[in-house]
């Protein structure tokens, strides 16, 4: 789709005389022949009788009156960007911000209507909330997001399913896990067979096997029997624990209420005053 050509107004001085009006008209004609923008002549006051006579004699319409040349929002060099899906993970959103060097993304629906905004600050706040181990369940995160964030592979389960219960838990040893693993928990484990088996037997909703470790067939068989999802990731336990909460979707953190909105015709100074308050 071709980009809309920019419109530029050419205006003479206030209380215009014939020279001012004709200069604006002539310069507008010249610029339209040479430039890639659309140029329009304007006047900054009422036309006097002499100028009206000259324009009528040559059959030229007088320029439209322009009473305000204050810069408007549409005059600002605004970077256009495509909207994002509200289900996008905050990890993916952050990566997009980093790669495109922007600090705000717009979440839109199928009709391209604005649903909310997510900023770098929102993502930073989410990452600093280290104690919310139930964030994936609260936000009903899809396993697709988890797989993408952890660069993982699902060995057992449905990638289209969503996490609806449980918390993120790191399984270290059966002794520490005993009584600590709750039904539905997402348990991050190493390659220790007994840790994987205990997590499954104690009702984990999913286990994430770290360091790309191979998963024994007996573990997969027990997981299938218990309805436990099995995921592998190349990341170690520390990295996986840091990353997994960033699989939560943008919609859980975005701002969707009390958003400041301005028309493209709003004066920049008026918009600045509103934003300052």
Tell me the role of every PLM-derived stretch:
Residues 117, 133-147:
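Short, solvent-exposed cationic patches
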Residues 130-139, 157-217, 231-233:
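Divalent-cation
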